[in-house]
C-alpha cells in the first residue's frame, strides 16, 4: 500500500524506478559474461626429474567480437595480459612466451592497439628444484587480462588455474606429451 500511495502522489516515481531497474539489469548482463575468455593448461612432459626444466602452455580462447590487450602495450593506461605464478621452493618460472599481437584500431582509443583475439597460446619454462622428491605437485597461477569489444572494455579480470605435474626419480624415463600444442610455441625468439 505504501508503494501505491507514493506512486499516486508523484507521477515521476514510476519512470525513475523503471529506469533504475533497466540500468541495473543491463549492467549485470554486460558484467556477467564470464565466458568471454576460457583457458586450458598443458605440460610438456609426463614426468619431471629433480632440477629439470619443463614447459607449460595456456591455451586462451577469446569469444568472437572480443579481444584482450597484448602483454606489452604502447599505451600505459591499458591493462596488459599477463601470466603470473605463485612463488614456491619447488619450482621457478624462468621464461615466458607471449605471441605476436595484432595491431587494431578501436573506437575507445585514438591509436592502434596491440591485441590478441580468437585463440592464442601463452607459455612458460618451469625449472624444478634439484631437491624435489618424487611425487605429485601443483603449480598455481593466474591469467590477468581485460576483455574489450570494439567500443569499450570490461573491468580487468583474472582466471586462476593449477597445473599438476609429477616428479619422478632420475632412473625413470620420461616422455614428451602435448606436442601438438607445444609445436606452436617458439621459445627461441623470446
Regions found by a protein language model. Name each.
Residues 15-25:
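Bacterial N-terminal signal peptides
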Residues 2-17:
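Bacterial N-terminal signal peptides that target proteins for export
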